Curated annotation (Swiss-Prot):
Involved in mRNA degradation. Catalyzes the phosphorolysis of single-stranded polyribonucleotides processively in the 3'- to 5'-direction. It comes from Chlorobaculum parvum (strain DSM 263 / NCIMB 8327). It is found in: Cytoplasm. This is Polyribonucleotide nucleotidyltransferase. It catalyses: RNA(n+1) + phosphate = RNA(n) + a ribonucleoside 5'-diphosphate. Its cofactor is Mg(2+). Mg(2+) binds at D502, D508. Its EC number is 2.7.7.8. Pfam families: KH_1 (PF00013), PNPase (PF03726), RNase_PH (PF01138), RNase_PH_C (PF03725), S1 (PF00575). Keywords: Cytoplasm, Magnesium, Metal-binding, Nucleotidyltransferase, RNA-binding, Transferase. Residues 638-712 form the S1 motif domain. One of its GO terms (molecular function) is polyribonucleotide nucleotidyltransferase activity. SUPFAM superfamilies: Eukaryotic type KH-domain (KH-domain type I), Nucleic acid-binding proteins, Ribonuclease PH domain 2-like, Ribosomal protein S5 domain 2-like.
Amino acid sequence: MFIKKEIDLGQGKVITIETGKMAKQADGSAVVRLNDTMVLATVVSSKTPPPPSQDFFPLQVEYREKYSAAGKFPGGFFKREGRPSEKEILSARLIDRALRPLFPDGYYQETQIIISVISSDTINDADVLGGIAASAAIMVSDIPFANPMSEVRVGRINGQFIVNPDTEELQRSDLDICIGGTEDTICMLEGEMKEISEAEMLDAIKFGHEAIKKLCAFQKELAAEVAKPKRAFAPTVAPAELVAFIEANCAAELKALAYTPLAKEERSDRTKAIYKETIAKTLEHFSSITAEEIAANPEKALCQSEHMIDECIHDVEKKVMRHMILDDSKRLDGRTLEQVRPISIELGLIPRAHGSALFTRGETQALVTLTLGTKKDAQSVDTLTDDKDKRFMLHYNFPPFSVGETGRVGGTGRREIGHGNLAERAIKMVMPAEQEFPYTVRLVSDILESNGSSSMASVCGGTLAAMDGGIPLKKPVSGIAMGLIKEGDRYAVLSDILGNEDHLGDMDFKVSGTRDGITACQMDIKIDGLDYHILETALEQARKGRLHILDVMTEAIPESREDIGKYAPRLTSIQIPVDAIGMVIGKGGETIRSITEETGAEINIDDDGTVTIACSSPEGTKAAVETIKTLVSKPEVGTIYMGKVRDIRDELGAFVEFLPKTDGLVHISEIARERIAKVSDVLKPGERVKVKLIDIRKDPRTGKTKFALSIKALLDTDQPAETNGEAKPARD
């Protein structure tokens, strides 16, 4: 049955959802459209029961942008889409993080959601549309999913909030936030801002939630019209006698352990020991259950399931920690709710890096290094809505040894890409303008230890490494991860959460910013019922923690160093006439390559005539600048050049190219002090010679300008060459 519905979100943003036309063999499918941007979402969930030992939800979310959607050809030899781009991975994570907590607890069927961008108007990003389409596809399927989820992007121009701004509007917006939620609550948040206040952030979330409510109600209407029955699903529940036995045998030990401040590794070892002992006791206690009893009551088999016993112990551990925090305002490492772990900072410890910082907060440690490059080092970004050179990037690496484990070491994982992107967005807002600091900047954050909040350690370490490397940041940025424990109406907001507090808690809310406002945020919620008062509390508590961390960072380095690292390339910019660009580049790049070879400088020329020269030595920079300036200048009498002999006329003289495409004659009488019989006895074609321009005149017959050069005039003075027709310094 084909159904098509339309909703107007205001401000000219009309969204259409249809189902029943495309991908009908999937469990559910939906097409969402905004202007000429369209996404197709499909969902399929396995009907084969998962193995009894499975304790996780194998959800796979794939987001793919087809180049054909925008009438483009993919790059590369094969001319087809390859592995997911960074943009596609980040979009998939946005959708995954919002949908995952909404599936029923205990639903472990293998489920795959594929979002395909099938049309793009190149100005409306399809990522939030993909979230709506994915939720709609699940709603019209038979997969158990009680409440729809919707995603919107919120911008603000001149104080006015905008829902789903296009790329042109985002250029003028001071914030870019993606919000995912249900009719009742927000479950996902991610974005970047230009130092907005906590109150402004809250207003943006409320504005976005109003649009989300409309879209969720819209999806419910669509699902009601399709009216597809949901498949039967009942989560496995542990028998009451099993729960009671486990609580009686391990709750006291787990509580005593929770109230004992320990390092991560020691706590983990002692927790594993309690698990092992409790599992053994439980299996022994229920070993007397017979096959006949299980046949009469299949639930009793769960009492002999090591997997179910493990889950029950985990529930007790979670309950103990949460009650400790709510009842006693005490945390696993002994801190108060708002206390930040001890911080240590070391700068400049990597000698050859252009800047470096080792940032340690508790048992989380990030080593961040800075590399400065030229425009040629910028990353080329080609997406459906963007085609640019990216001159600032932050890469995040999370090796398995950082958590005391072994594991695969290879390509960058989705989590690493997501964490790096968040840290990059936080610092990007305070990076200097290209005109002020024309370098390409790469920060690499290697996590050496992790016990929570490693992405925020990357923000702090990245800021410190940038300042150590002499980048004139507008302001320093710090970051902090907030947690939440909520039971009914009782709740506690935690500052600078540990890994266990993230795992056993209800929220992971990362906030980065300067002293004056927020620059980036990311939030994931595992529960329903998060109200705005809790968000307001979390934002204010995050502000206090952020300022505390900034105080520690400022003690380590009050402001950016005055100069860049000694091994960083030095950039110098000069302006040349646009019509002289070809002269500097030369035929087939001959001239510019020549300058690079002789001076060691790397040269980039923009279309507006801006020439950027990068060289590690001041001498090379000076030589390159002088050569380029002379190349684009008009010939002047008395100026000395380094030229190349182009042609020899034995009885007349030598024609020397002293500027690109500009030849002059060195008369035979101007070659040497003594008389010479043949020019070829002294000069050879291709030879470089130092010449002085002694006369400029027009040929009365042809009207062409002729240049008279002299070698002899320099033999007495022995002056150094001021330039080089081939853009190379003089050599005697």
